[in-house]
């Protein structure tokens, strides 16, 4: 599958650089360029990209508002947003995930890291750079959001293994890495993630990460991962 990428950044030079990178990659193509959030929303509807590479600070409509409108549009449910920005602070990371972004990466990332990030997002997984993960932890420790009552009730439906998997996913681990931590197959890890998403009514893996932090399923002390539990 060729991954269709839409670029949204107010700097034409950066868009040109990204276009050359994606168009020179066998499994990707650039389907459009937007210089502000409004253009990004319109092009997302017109081109139906798999991934929108979104800057935060843009004129007319910023990247967070554009991301929120894309994620709330039923006709754009298949479109994933990867935030690429210089602002990897705690508030921006939290707001981006609340808006519906599937990933968050700093502009200092190497080209191969960006390409891998786009592939990860297109495959339906969430992605946070290590610094973004630390910022998210800091944000929820300093000013934790209350766990919504309906979500708190759904947490009771999670098995111990599903709680383990959600916690590891919130730390940024892929299905393969979760499988290695818990000594299960990647398919089993993916199944547990999908079941947890269904039980918690999470629209995607990124929202699952937000729920994990809001409801205390992950903390800095969990960096080494939970101990293996029985299937």
Question: Where in the sequence are the language-model features?
Answer:
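Active-site residues of response regulator receiver
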Residues: 9, 55, 85
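Acidic catalytic/metal-coordinating carboxylates
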Residues: 36-39, 61-68, 88
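Basic, Lys/Arg-enriched C-terminal extension of HTH/homeodomain DNA-binding domains
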Residues: 40, 197-231
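Short amphipathic alpha-helix used as the core "switch/output" element in two-component signaling
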Residues: 42, 64-77
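Active-site beta3 strand of CheY-like receiver
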Residues: 47-53
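Receiver (REC) domain active-site loop signature in two-component systems and cognate sites
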Residues: 58
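Short, flexible helix-to-coil linker/hinge segments that flank and couple to helix-turn-helix
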Residues: 93-98, 103, 108-160, 214-220
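Recognition helix of helix-turn-helix DNA-binding domains
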Residues: 172-207
């Amino acid at each position: 599958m060729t991954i269709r990428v839409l670029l949204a950044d107010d700097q034409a030079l950066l868009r040109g650089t990204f276009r050359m990178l994606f168009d020179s990659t066998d499994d990707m193509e650039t389907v459009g360029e937007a210089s502000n959030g409004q253009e990004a929303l319109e092009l997302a509807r017109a081109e139906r990209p798999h991934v929108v590479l979104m800057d935060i600070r843009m004129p007319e409509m910023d990247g967070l508002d554009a991301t929120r409108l894309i994620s709330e549009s039923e006709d754009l449910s298949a479109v994933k947003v990867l935030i690429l920005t210089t602002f990897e602070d705690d508030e921006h990371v939290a707001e981006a995930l609340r808006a519906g972004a599937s990933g968050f990466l700093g502009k200092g990332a190497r080209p191969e890291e960006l390409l891998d990030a786009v592939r990860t997002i297109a495959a339906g997984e969430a992605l946070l750079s290590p610094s973004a993960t630390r910022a998210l932890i800091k944000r929820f420790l300093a000013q934790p959001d209350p766990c919504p009552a309906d979500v708190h009730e759904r947490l009771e439906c999670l098995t111990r293994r599903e709680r383990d998997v959600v916690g590891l996913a919130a730390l940024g681990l892929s299905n393969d890495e979760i499988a290695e931590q818990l000594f299960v197959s990647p398919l089993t890890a993916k199944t547990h993630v999908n079941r947890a998403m269904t039980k918690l009514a999470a629209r995607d893996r990124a929202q699952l990460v937000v729920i994990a932090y809001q409801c205390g399923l992950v903390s800095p002390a969990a960096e080494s991962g939970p101990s293996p539990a029985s299937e």
